[in-house]
Amino acid sequence: MFLYVAVGSLVVARLLLYPLRPADLTPPYWVAMGATAITVLAGAHIVEMADAPMAIVTSGLVAGASVVFWAFGPWLIPPLVAASIWKHVVHRVPLRYEATLWSVVFPLGMYGVGAYRLGLAAHLPIVESIGEFEGWVALAVWTITFVAMLHHLAATIGRSGRSSHAIGAADDTHAIICRPPRSFDHQVRAFRRNQPM
């Protein structure tokens, strides 16, 4: 909890103290919601541990803390969605596939699982239903991200295939000479030679 508050404070300070450009809003900001969701899931598992004496003593406190973290997670969704709209709609930054988009998928899925488990553990049917719905949202986002990744992969392979064909068709006077990468041992020896004695 302390680490979460410390990192959250640093992120908020960065957002408030420095000018924010659209390119600065990257998908990893969604990880903040994922951290709350993991906390909710862990709390739900502790509440469900009926046989452990320590779990029996702390189950009320853990259940209450889990509900607080669960309530904080959805509070983060509107600002994150608004930031994405500000970046891609208002400032017209194209939405292209990048590997960091997967950091949106995980928090949504974890939030769905955490809410579902908390609903079961604390006997809160509304929270359980929200978890089920969020699971479907996470599956949809996963599918969109996966299809975008496949499209990006196909486009990248297509580009590299066209460029290698163009290189093969070039005449010999303009041939590109490729040198194999240096071995690790060679790099270590070069590093040691450049070190002062």
Swiss-Prot record:
This protein serves as an immunogenic antigen, inducing gamma-interferon responses in whole-blood cultures from M.tuberculosis-exposed adults in Uganda, The Gambia and South Africa, indicating this might be a good vaccine candidate. It comes from Mycobacterium tuberculosis (strain ATCC 25618 / H37Rv). It is a multi-pass membrane protein. The keyword Membrane applies. The keyword Protease does not apply. Gene3D superfamilies: Voltage-dependent anion channel. Its main location: membrane. Signal peptide: none annotated. It is found in: Cell membrane. This is Uncharacterized membrane protein Rv1735c. Keywords: Cell membrane, Membrane, Transmembrane, Transmembrane helix. Pfam families: SLAC1. One of its GO terms (biological process) is transmembrane transport. The chain crosses the membrane at residues 30-50, 61-81, 101-121, 130-150. GO terms for cellular component: plasma membrane.
